[in-house]
């Protein structure tokens, strides 16, 4: 428990502290609305409602404390969603508001992806009924976005799925590499689980889009651009570790389904890892273990090992 308290203090932005009957509340970024003049706004962050780190520690230690946190997490996720089909973000991001005039509620693809995986990977172990359904529902949502217009075409049948789906506004948003990879990985997992070709077809459309524009995504310093806009321009600094974790997961999934994509993914893994090494930004435990799993440990970035991706 002492180690958990120390870890929570060191990673205070990614650990829950204030639990309520409505779910965990955390200090919100000042780029969210509503926000009081003091800047001391508190709310529910969907990525923190699910207790990923507690799940890892429970699997390692089988500690009752972490088990309780996970049960609590499933209850909070159910209460948050209520009778809706998906988990909707309930606060406005001024970043999205300034770019696209999007206000809450909206669907964040990364949030729903991570929640679907939380249910899929651990729900059955905790007695959650139909624990695979969030995976199916979210994969179906991704497949439907081309028909709804929430995509960025590349060529032929290749495209990226937009990051955000507004509930009220009718606008197409950008597609960031981490969201693109996360969505593709969900589709591949859904294909493996349910053997429905529509999931594989959508995943191929995304992977071939990345292959077509690989050179545009990779920056001169080896890093990857954060996102592509509906106008096809590339902007923004990428996350330090998160996208590399996603690339490794993509490699693992395509390895068993269609290995023809592996050279492309290895090139992107090598480029991103080289950038991290040059900047001495280190790596996460997921990156280290993932590279070992796919036999590419030679790309492990230089620097310190970290628990949480930056």
Task: Name each model-derived stretch.
Residues 38-63, 71, 86-125:
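A structural/positional concept
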Residues 20-42, 85-108, 151-176, 219-246, ...:
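Carbohydrate-binding/catalytic loop surfaces
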Residues 4-41, 66-89, 129-156, 197-223, ...:
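Long, well-ordered core segments of solenoidal/helical folds
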Residues 304-310:
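Long, low-complexity, intrinsically disordered segments
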Residues 107-116, 138, 142, 151-165, ...:
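Long, contiguous hydrophobic alpha-helical segments, chiefly transmembrane helices and signal peptides
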Residues 49-67, 113-129, 181-196, 243-260:
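Well-ordered alpha-helical scaffold segments within catalytic/enzyme domains
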Residues 169-235:
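Active-site/pore-lining binding-face segments in mid-to-C-terminal subdomains
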